[in-house]
Swiss-Prot record:
GO cellular component: small ribosomal subunit
Family under the similarity heading: Belongs to the universal ribosomal protein uS7 family.
Molecular function as annotated in GO: rRNA binding; structural constituent of ribosome; tRNA binding
Keyword Iron-sulfur: no
Record-given protein name: Small ribosomal subunit protein uS7
Keywords, ordered alphabetically: Plasmid, Ribonucleoprotein, Ribosomal protein, RNA-binding, rRNA-binding, tRNA-binding
PANTHER family in the cross-refs: RIBOSOMAL PROTEIN S7
BP GO terms, sorted: translation
Length: 156
């Protein structure tokens, strides 16, 4: 046990345009090399493109996309005796969001559109319709957990 006090979680400041903490977190996931203003431009442009293509609000589509990418279970490696088992575990809510955002950004970076804003917009639209690489990643993780359900009793 640490002798010092337990450090609490930092409060994240909402983004300046939509006043959303979720969007602020997403901007931080997109950001590279500390270039936050560039990340904000990319996100806001992507949200504008998404709002043009769909008649829903910006944040509704982002929320729908993240909902469809969030994993409920994942596998963790657990060494028992001489062998390593992939043990299915439930994912905590904070980690669910983090994984969903990370997978959405990774999938967007692999797409072929011209700019990152267009890639991200395309991936968000696909994810909101339960298609795309990020949703496939979630399904792969769920399939892996389902396949290793026999090792669930090794949970810790």
């Amino acid at each position: 046990m640490p002798r010092r006090r337990v450090v609490g979680q930092r409060k994240i400041l909402p983004d300046p345009k939509f006043h959303s903490e979720l969007l602020a977190k997403f901007i931080n996931v997109i950001m590279q090399d500390g270039k936050k203003s560039t990340a904000e431009k990319i996100i806001y442009k992507a949200l504008d493109v998404v709002a043009e293509k769909k008649s829903e609000s910006h944040l509704t589509i982002l929320e729908a996309a993240l909902d469809n990418v969030r994993p409920s279970v994942e596998v963790k490696s657990r060494r028992v005796g001489g062998s390593t088992y992939q043990v299915p575990c439930e994912v905590r809510p904070v980690r669910r969001n983090a994984l969903a955002m990370r997978w959405l950004v990774e999938a967007a970076r692999k797409r072929g559109e011209k700019s990152m804003a267009l890639r991200l917009a395309g991936e968000m639209l696909d994810a909101s319709e339960n298609k795309g690489t990020a949703v496939k990643k979630r399904e792969d993780v769920h399939r892996m957990a389902e396949a290793n359900k026999a090792f669930a009793h090794y949970r810790w």
